[in-house]
């Protein structure tokens, strides 16, 4: 009994504290406030401040009572605690310009600081004070000023109440002021950039070089770094602003500025000063703020080195860059600008540098996972601990177009050894195991997933952490299912704390925890409550609040986590009087009867489970979980005890710069990094020994490891000082082949999608440098479709009926289920004006594809594939016609090709309501149809197996396409639509369809696509309908074709095809063979040297032979440049026997650049050209930076590979190329990709004036020195002149200027319908035909009242010529049928006004004649003296000036009439003479003739020749008028009775008038009916 009584007494003594603990209630004080959302704490004090409305309130007792501060007279917009003087200094910004308030005594008193006044009409939008970590008197004030602009409220109201807008944010300026006397005086640090009129925004960003008391940077206390930027926003063509920048250092408060030389020719995008590094981010392209960036690192503010990035950095979050405890740089990368608003600005990837800050790498387990939001949490008080979470973007909640079936997995992992090893967050909670949907003992498939850790604001504890999240495999994440968890071992294992998500805060180093649910109804009680724990989360007690609030924050009043007092800030919507905020002060300081812990209440807790981290073992003394006391060391920081480890291990080392970790974690050499380093610069040997490991900077282990060197091969490694040294190559190896790839055509990044031989999809956003696999939920990808109207969208079809869609270039994918139908492999058809609207074709009743019941069905979706509706049965091809036409008859019109199950014919139907109620049959029987360039063209079968084409430009009116009648065109059995651009359709009409011997005629239409003329005969095509036809991108009217030169014999099956290449510079009106270069690439003459291009010209392999149709001759951004594989000779040779040729003037002149066939690619608008051998293994490429004048070879890999393709972004504007290659390996072959980056070989970016003006780096020049007029104008193009700079994202092809419009010549016209171009250059009517009925135009345009007959010519649509030759001059107008009355009214003249004018003129003439007769003739003797008057006579009466004028008129009249009489007499005699001569000589010969349309050069000058502007022209005119008088000798002139003598049959060359151009003598011998009419002269 005694023993039992003793045990009972002991149990009672132990129980008393627990009873006290249970009975303990914290002290809670409520304050009602208005508009108070952030409470700030001064460090190591009981003082809190907050902004309430526009004033500042303060509490000196941890928030129990509040009062308004004295000394602040202005309305306040913001308050903040000085991060370097957290104990006593705070700053409040005034609503008024240039004023701030500062306190240095925890808010007891405030001093007003006044900054310099702004300029007139310039208003401050707020100022911010930055302080110095070591000197309290050093300030930097940063202010933003904008022009005051009153804006019309009706057009642009400032707010909902219509207040006027007073800031013009497009003209804003940052200003920085410095003070070294505590704010008593300020001086401006003025930007060293001059602001011009185009600068919309000027930015000045300055900061002290010292960023902390422990800063390791070599700098003085007065060192200030400033970044000045000017941004110009005036050009619509640019997707982003032009930026110029300067990064400078000042040590004398801005009096003098020293620019960092390394960044003089670069665009500095931002900078960040850290503890031991300064990081500078430079923008790769000043004209594209989405371009890739470079990272530069320095530890002394003078020497910067470019860091190695494993991917393109395009959207860094510069304000989030920080250093961890090891000195590694943590670089978050934000996502690009998304179409989804909620995705903008989120962290998409995190890169971590080595301890030197020069080599970055991603978190290993996130590198090849699905792309998503990444969060990294590193509690500073837990050395070596990192918690990272990956959350797939495709699973973002409430996304537009969110689809079902998405299974992309997120994951959260933890590392306690600085990221060397990672593990999932294990849930070890047997008591709650049944509450989870998965087996928590299966850690890999059932772990804690969270998303909300942040780097800032974590309270130090001894390994006690809380978070919200869910437990699962990461495939499902619903915010509503979150719960709250707690850990006591630094995050390695977790237990459930609450079944709902909570806000939480810890105090007393983790011994006191407060949690409040986000939603008060979580416990089925509408009133709010908070929970608290005094045993590190083991048990929880509820405290009921009397008001329902929405918690905004809960915080410990001591930022270091040592105190036991908390603030709960929340708001309610129930009060209508404006008192919406409730502030609760919660005090736990008297818990456990105010007992303070003693030594035996503590235990040691070891970080990282006692392992060495950074060469040190860390431990913390913490209170035992069940101890009945509080630590109560208020304002003391948590102590971390460390013990250096004796031996260094591999965990204390990192890979040297030249090495990377392989899949096993071993450091192996990397060729690309070796090229970037300088290890091979120091030796002439083939190999150099390098240690693969280096000790982590700052590691404290005592005894280093012995690291053996590894021999690195230096063969082929470029030496320092060469351009090749700066080329960066990234190699990726695969155990599969890439079968498909395609870039997204945007300037945002270099994203491309790839499909391998296994049907797996991969995405890259950096031109192939890094590649991620697309999660397709285990489905094989069987087809990929890109949206041609929205460049960021693509659709992947899965083998199990899923469709994976992306609208952000593969950053995220959404999954939907296709309709229950068999996939037929038909492409999607898209709406050009609605991104989420498209048509999918599936097979219905298709158990077998050969089943008679199997038929296609068109399914329509308007929500990006989330839902489908059946639109039309038996449809096999549809078009959203209403979205394609410029002027559609109905914008909702859809056209579909329908093939009924029971019929072999196809029909064309249309609808304006997606075939719900409206269905119109357009054609009963068609072969097919297609859309191109605003036209829809339908092929309709005709009798005798012929085809007819019908064209529409509005979807309602169809017109038959009239093909030219030609002697070599038989049946219209096949045609190919080649292109439609600027109002014309190019079409190839087959004239021979024997397989392997195919060819046909090239045709071109008029503006509405209905009337075609022949441009060229016997143009080559293949059996599949592809044609050797290519329009040169970016230039008007230049086309290359291959013709079958022996077409007659090929058609008769006597010979194989012999191809020749032809070029036109005026859109097909005239064709010529390509001029061959004089010498080959080795300087030797070509074997064929005939001056006749028909026998010796350049020939190129064309479209019909390409492996990839995207490999075009030209590039739209590299104007005038073309590559081709061909030969010089009489015709085209086989591909393997050909060379590679290049031109820079649009095809006028060519040069051989390689002796063998090569693949080519353009970069930087032609500023970088790359060639790689085709069909042969290689380890090198050739590149040129001077537009092909010189070429350099570069070894891009160690082993030779067979390059399958070379590619870059579709706009050919990037400096990065991607090679696909295959290399032979042991046991087979491996597929490889090589990303080759040329950015660094250029010294700088070219200086470009965004208004298009010439500069030092750009000049306007014609395409070639021989270029004159093309399409009626002379054009100059803006071109780069300095090969040492790169162009970047400038749409250079859009900067051209027309010098002048030229006079019209023969080259500005083409033959009209039913006319053909004869060998003499004239357009002649096809034999046996009449001109097209010109009156047909009246039927097409009912409003017309007149029409004109065709002249046989029509002006080329692209021509802008003015004046000159008018070959298309219309005839006299004719009245349209039925419009005779309107026609007569248009051209008739009213009799009344006409009679009045006519009579008035007659009266004036009569009066003038009478006056002259009276004063000049009658007074001087009348007509009797008329014959006696002579010029200069003085016998006439002249009494005044009027008499003199009248007499002069009389004398002049007499002179004129006398000469006219003589001339008439002379003419009469000559006519009689000629008639007599003709009668006697008629039949002997015809007279000489003059032909007008023989030679272009003659015609170009004909207008001037016949205009009488110069002496030679007048001679020619006289020559034509007196055609029978030339070359007649004097003694041959007969009398009337004499017989005519003969004259020579041909004129000699000396008799040709001087005005004729040389070589055109044959054109002057027949002045017949073909001479141009006066209106053409």
Swiss-Prot record:
GO term, biological process aspect, one: protein targeting to vacuole
Xref: Gene3D superfamilies: 2.10.70.80, 2.120.10.10, 3.30.60.270, YVTN repeat-like/Quinoprotein amine dehydrogenase
Pfam families the record matches: Sortilin-Vps10 (PF15902), Sortilin_C (PF15901)
Transmembrane segments: 1392-1412
Ranges in the topological domain labelled Lumenal: 22-1391
Residues in the signal sequence: 1-21
Ranges per topology, Cytoplasmic: 1413-1577
Protein's cellular compartments: Golgi apparatus, trans-Golgi network membrane; Prevacuolar compartment membrane
InterPro entries assigned: Sialidase_sf, Sortilin_C, Sortilin_N, VPS10, VPS10-sortilin, WD40/YVTN_repeat-like_dom_sf
BNR repeat segments: 58-68, 101-111, 179-187, 414-423, 485-495, 531-541, 762-771, 859-869, 1141-1150, 1183-1192
Location of the region described as Disordered in the Swiss-Prot/TrEMBL record: 1531-1577
UniProt membrane topology term: Single-pass type I membrane protein
Positions of glycan attachment: 121, 168, 445, 791, 1008, 1301
Chief place where the protein resides: Golgi
Swiss-Prot/TrEMBL keywords: Glycoprotein, Golgi apparatus, Membrane, Protein transport, Receptor, Repeat, Signal, Transmembrane, Transmembrane helix, Transport
A cellular-component GO term for this protein: cytosol
Family, as annotated: Belongs to the VPS10-related sortilin family.
Functional note: Functions as a sorting receptor in the Golgi compartment required for the intracellular sorting and delivery of soluble vacuolar proteins, like carboxypeptidase Y (CPY) and proteinase A. Executes multiple rounds of sorting by cycling between the late Golgi and a prevacuolar endosome-like compartment. Binds the Golgi-modified P2 form of CPY, and this interaction is dependent on the presence of an intact CPY vacuolar protein sorting signal.
The protein's name: Vacuolar protein sorting/targeting protein PEP1
Organism of origin: Saccharomyces cerevisiae (strain Lalvin EC1118 / Prise de mousse)
